């Protein structure tokens, strides 16, 4: 893949399709006209909330309350560079009293009120969460560990590498609360069927009840150190990508003020497990959100 890319630029796009991936998650297929797109799997774009008339008063209120401008929001690309259309997948954020300082601004609009034909301006493309040439050259196996919408850049990276590079074997550990929360379930199954020797998925579900049919590919509970060592016993030639939730600045600040200790986050737990298994911290590529 060519590491050189164009400078970040603004593009006006049109929503060509809206695909429901999970109850609170949609993929927006974006038509860019004749604009040449130069990006890497794992990159993200940004969208400014100021361009949406429905948010005008809400943006003004939050800016007055915070005393600063509302920044653009970042969304990882679902699409890969070989595909005709650009795509992002948006999971609706929720306001949780005592946890989130302000109600989410843009994701509810994108996930619930975006229709075909709608136009918007995006800015892209950038981000460090990529399978670059150096990492690709030094690895034979790739372990991906993600949770929730952390699958979005992960999916882009995996499908592109499977299609255009024959060297690597990919293993994905993907954690969600319930089965219905799994994003890209059918797409991941199709990739497994198409590349049975190179791609394997293990799902972990943390909140399914006892009536759910768990098996070797659908496990109960959180990602554990034991599971990681089971699916990736040798890290000598393995690249590791981790994408999922971490503690927010607000959560850390609130806990400090109350003198409380935060429970380990998904990102914190997984990185700790990997380090205890002997993976150097600088060998772990990570991207977090919260």
For each of these PLM feature ranges, what is it?
Residues 42, 150, 245:
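Short, conserved phosphate/pyrophosphate- and ester-handling motifs at nucleotide-, phospho-/glycolipid
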Residues 141-157:
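A phosphate-binding catalytic loop at a beta-strand-loop-alpha-helix junction
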Residues 124-138:
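A short, basic/flexible loop-to-alpha-helix module at the beginning of a structural domain
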Residues 173-290:
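Reductase modules of NAD(P)H-dependent flavoproteins
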Residues 77, 153-165:
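Histidine-anchored nucleotide/phosphate-binding helix
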């Amino acid at each position: 893949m060519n590491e050189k890319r164009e400078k970040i630029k603004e593009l006006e796009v049109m929503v060509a399709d809206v695909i429901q991936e999970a109850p609170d998650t949609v993929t927006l297929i974006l038509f860019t006209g004749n604009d040449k797109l130069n990006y890497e799997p794992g990159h993200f774009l940004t969208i400014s909330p100021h361009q949406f008339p429905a948010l005008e008063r809400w943006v003004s209120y939050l800016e007055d309350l915070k005393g600063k401008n509302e920044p653009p929001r970042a969304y990882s690309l679902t699409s890969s560079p070989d595909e005709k259309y650009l795509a992002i997948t948006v999971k609706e954020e929720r306001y949780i009293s005592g946890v989130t300082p302000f109600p989410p601004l843009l994701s509810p609009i994108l996930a619930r009120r975006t229709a075909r034909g709608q136009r918007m301006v995006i800015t892209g493309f950038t981000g460090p969460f990529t399978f670059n040439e150096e990492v690709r050259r030094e690895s034979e196996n790739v372990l991906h560990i993600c949770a929730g919408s952390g699958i979005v850049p992960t999916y882009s990276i995996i499908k592109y590498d499977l299609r255009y590079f024959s060297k690597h074997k990919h293993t994905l550990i993907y954690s969600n609360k319930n089965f219905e929360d799994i994003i890209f379930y059918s797409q991941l199954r199709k990739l497994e069927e198409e590349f049975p020797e190179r791609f394997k998925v293990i799902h972990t579900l943390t909140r399914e009840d006892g009536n759910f049919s768990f098996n070797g590919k659908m496990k109960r509970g959180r990602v554990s150190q034991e599971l990681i060592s089971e699916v990736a016993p040798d890290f000598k030639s393995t690249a590791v990508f981790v994408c999922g939730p971490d503690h927010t600045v607000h959560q850390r600040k609130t806990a400090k003020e109350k003198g409380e200790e935060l429970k380990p986050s998904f990102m914190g737990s997984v990185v700790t497990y990997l380090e205890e298994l002997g993976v150097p911290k600088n060998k772990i590529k990570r991207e977090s959100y919260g």
